[in-house]
From Swiss-Prot:
Gene Ontology CC annotations of this record: cytosol; mitochondrial inner membrane; mitochondrion; respiratory chain complex III
Family statement drawn from the similarity comment of this UniProt entry: Belongs to the UQCR10/QCR9 family.
Mitochondrial matrix side: 1-25
Description of how the protein assembles with itself and partners: Component of the ubiquinol-cytochrome c oxidoreductase (cytochrome b-c1 complex, complex III, CIII), a multisubunit enzyme composed of 10 subunits. The complex is composed of 3 respiratory subunits cytochrome b (MT-CYB), cytochrome c1 (CYC1-1 or CYC1-2) and Rieske protein (UCR1-1 or UCR1-2), 2 core protein subunits MPPalpha1 (or MPPalpha2) and MPPB, and 5 low-molecular weight protein subunits QCR7-1 (or QCR7-2), UCRQ-1 (or UCRQ-2), QCR9, UCRY and probably QCR6-1 (or QCR6-2).
UniProt-recorded name of the protein: Cytochrome b-c1 complex subunit 9, mitochondrial
Summary of the function given for this chain in its UniProt record: Component of the ubiquinol-cytochrome c oxidoreductase, a multisubunit transmembrane complex that is part of the mitochondrial electron transport chain which drives oxidative phosphorylation.
Bilayer topology: Single-pass membrane protein
Main location group: mitochondrion
Mitochondrial intermembrane side stretches: 43-72
Leader sequence residues: none
UniProt xrefs under InterPro entries: QCR9, QCR9_sf
Superkingdom as given in the UniProt entry: Eukaryota
A GO biological process held by the record: mitochondrial electron transport, ubiquinol to cytochrome c
Length: 72
């Protein structure tokens, strides 16, 4: 009984191992792709958070900066 329960718990890890970690080339590709897409996701999230917290304080928000008054 105990062996069957233990074997069912390892199923997810065995599947992950067989899918990703069995061959070194697949494992390295998975790590590099994960790092690339993880960095992109963190960069996007931090950029959106920065923009949301600094609305009205950014260069793009100042409409008259660098413009000369029009003389009529």
């Amino acid at each position: 009984m105990e062996y069957a329960a233990r074997r069912n718990q390892k199923g997810a890890f065995e599947g992950f191992y067989k899918l990703i970690m069995r061959r070194n080339s697949v494992y390295v590709t998975f790590i590099i792709a994960g790092a690339f897409f993880g960095e992109r996701a963190v960069d996007y999230g931090v950029h959106k958070l920065w923009e949301r917290n600094n609305v009205g304080k950014r260069y793009e928000d100042i409409s008259v900066l660098g413009q000369r008054p029009v003389e009529e």
